[in-house]
Amino acid sequence: MDEIGGDGRQGEYRRQKKEHIPFIYIRQRYEKLLFPRFSLAYNLLICPMSYNSLRTSKNINKTKFIRLMKTFRLLIVALLLAGSASAQRYERRAMRGEYSPTVYLISVQEVDTIYNYGPYAMQQAAVLNRMAMDNATQDYIETHRPGFQQVEKPQFVFATKNNLFSFSLGGFVSLRAGYDFDGIVDNIDFVTYDIPVHGSYDTRQKLMMDASTSRLFMKAITNTRALGRVVVFMDADFRGGAEGSYTPRLRSAYVSFLGFTLGRDVTTFCDLSAAPTTIDFQGPNAYNFNFATMIRYEYAFADNHLKFGVAAEMPSVSGTYNDNFATLKQRVPDFPAYFQYAWGANRDSHIRASGVVRNMYLHNLRTGNNTSLLGWGVQFSGTIKVAQPLRLFMNGVYGKGVTPYIQDLTGSGLDFTPNPENADQIQTMPMWGWQAAAQINLTPRLFISGGYSTVRVQRSHGFYSDDQYKQGQYIFGNIFYSITPRCKVAGEYLYGSRKDMSNDKGHANRVNVMLQYSF
């Protein structure tokens, strides 16, 4: 009897045969249950690896060869098990409309595979795998941040079985098409500041198609003893260069733990849930969605009814200089803070009070001295779920020298201007804005929304120039429909106007459509 070389090695043969029996039993018992789509793969890759095929010549290191075949076999089984289990799990939850990403469990230890398990142990392993998938899914549910221009929860998650680390990739492809008529906006987004006041033959109609708002994001979650849950997030779009260049742009890049956020994120002054959903990438002109590099701390208490946050953020100053003043590098961060009260079963309604204080430095060429101006702003914002189908959004802001915190005025040069009555002096400009909108959910897949927004720059000792921005108005109405949980289409109408200090006025109309697919 030639049992893998003979020569008294029957014991080794028995051990190898005994090790092989559970795998054959598992494959025959559970193949149809776990791997209905992979039977051909088993027949081609697994069956030829029975112990009879291991009969080789005596000069081959049989033990190493057996271990190599076992490792190869284990790898295939583990991959098929992960793919089948996560696919079945996704199908069950997707039918119920729940968040159900495809979770791939990562393991490099042989004891974690099903090869060494009997039928009962294999059932226990399957239960543990499902628990690991549920824990990873729960991590992404609890750390998801909804709101204006925020990404959806990821569809693909890679996680360790001990739930210490998980990693996900995702994004969406978005195509926007728009047509301006009876006046245009000199911007791919509907920025009322950029509406030409004195039109010409070239400012009557305009066609646009844009995919630069498509998004890619990466998110990693680590559960630690010392720092608790650590979240690393990065996302990017293609708005980094001139219009139509599709240059990649880093939007956010931060790490958060124990209430701290370190890196680049949406400014703390912004209430992400206070703005409606729009096809227009800019959104209401009185909103304040801008990015900043920051150190932020947030804390929720009273069963998440109350929350506050405070931050130090890199300043962005945009002023108007004359011959007596020059730019100067900034020396003090902006300090935004907020306090929020939330209610509802999921704390899905809230009101928030926010404030920001900033110091803006510039150089006085006439005196040769450096000087600074104090800027400040306050805001009231929130979202309220009035009834099951109806939700309201609003924010109102007032301040001096706070153009980074009012979208229509960002980069406008209106943080400060020379005093019209005394060119040797410079002054911060008072400004305010507000927006209100409503969303009606007609069905779980279909909603309509509409709203109004306005921004105003007040005069201070008169005005600096006739063409200085005075007021902008933004009106919108749209409809969104989700064809599938990952694919949605939308249509939108926008009207906007701009008025200068001279009371000259221009207006524009735009129709937008959008197709977006998330992955």
Predicted regions and their residues:
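Outer-membrane beta-barrel "beta-signal"
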Residues: 481-483, 507-519
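N-terminal periplasmic/intermembrane-space "pro-region" immediately following the signal or transit peptide
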Residues: 87-181
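Detector for outer-membrane/organellar transmembrane beta-barrel domains
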Residues: 346-462, 469
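Outer membrane beta-barrel
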Residues: 160-187, 201-318, 336, 340-343, ...
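Residues that define the transmembrane beta-barrel architecture of outer-membrane proteins
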Residues: 165, 205-214, 247-251, 256, ...
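Outer-membrane beta-barrel translocator domains and adjoining extracellular loop/strand segments
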Residues: 183-188, 243-250, 273-280, 319-327, ...
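Transmembrane beta-strand segments that form the barrel wall of outer-membrane beta-barrel proteins
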Residues: 229-240, 310-314, 354-359, 447-460, ...
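Bacterial Sec-dependent N-terminal signal peptides
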Residues: 23-25, 29-92
